[in-house]
Amino acid sequence: MKKTRTANLHHLYHEPLPENLKLTPKVEVDNVHQRQTTDVYEHALTITAWQQIYDQLHPGKFHGEFTEILLDDIQVFREYTGLALRQSCLVWPNSFWFGIPATRGEQGFIGSQCLGSAEIATRPGGTEFELSTPDDYTILGVVLSEDVITRQANFLHNPDRVLHMLRNQSALEVKEQHKAALWGFVQQALATFCENPENLHQPAVRKVLGDNLLMAMGAMLEEAQPMVTAESISHQSYRRLLSRAREYVLENMSEPVTVLDLCNQLHVSRRTLQNAFHAILGIGPNAWLKRIRLNAVRRELISPWSQSMTVKDAAMQWGFWHLGQFATDYQQLFSEKPSLTLHQRMREWG
């Protein structure tokens, strides 16, 4: 069936929402989800009631795994991504998200703040944020509606302090034993209810699970502190510079953005730009620009909402005028020919 709806594939939706629209996940029959994904665009669509846009930064065939359970005004999930990503995220309104990364392996970032073994990420719903994650990365997510926190404020000793922190901080330092306890609880809950999802249809089961989760969250948040970053000021500013660079590229899709354009727009020298990209990503700005544009073309080729009907249309839209070189670069990054990406979309959606 052909889709006629138009959508912006490269930006999140920021229009004011109707007052009566509630995006809190609905707990009905379908409240346990498990998915295996082979594409970052597909993976970005897996989390219920979120908006996300992912860019694949490292070459290879992507593999992702996602598991979630939905309670009454509570969402719990585990996300695994096999390749390094840059993520734009927007959680459902009137909620708070908590990201609990695995303690093993390379560290991820929320904005310019590093998420180490004693840190968690947090953002209010309806507020866009950016994550940078390395290869082979696992993170647990807990989303609590503001209604739940208000109704169950007794699980917090000092709710005003905690809520102020959640509204104004993107990363918190927590006790490692509390983080480990929450990690174990969430993992056990996901494993149990993925094996027996019908048990979550019982209101009593959902209530006990939700209350136990709130107690574990409360123990962690009561002793949490705003994160004091150990990363240098220069590295933090470099990360902010990269975020601004990406937004500029995607806001100016009518013409290919060059390194000179970035220098002029961001008011930095070519050397500063080079230093920022090499310090944070290990590649130069030219290579990065190409990867961001290749990801944009892939979204145009793979999305059922895309208006691009040929590889040439999508490539030219993002400034790839040498189609042979474009096809080579595309296959090197995604381990797939662009014609195959488009063919799969046309076969499925017409």
Curated annotation (Swiss-Prot):
**Which residues are in the HTH araC/xylS-type domain?**
243-344
Any one Gene Ontology MF annotation carried by this entry is: DNA-binding transcription factor activity
Superkingdom, according to UniProt? Bacteria
The pathway it acts in is: Amine and polyamine degradation; ethanolamine degradation
From the record, what ranges are coiled-coil?
A: none
Q: Which residues bind DNA?
A: 260-281, 311-334
**Sorted alphabetically, which keywords does the UniProt record give?**
Activator, DNA-binding, Transcription, Transcription regulation
SUPFAM superfamilies annotated for this entry? Homeodomain-like
The protein's name in its UniProt record: HTH-type DNA-binding transcriptional activator EutR
Give the species this sequence originates from. Answer: Escherichia coli (strain K12)
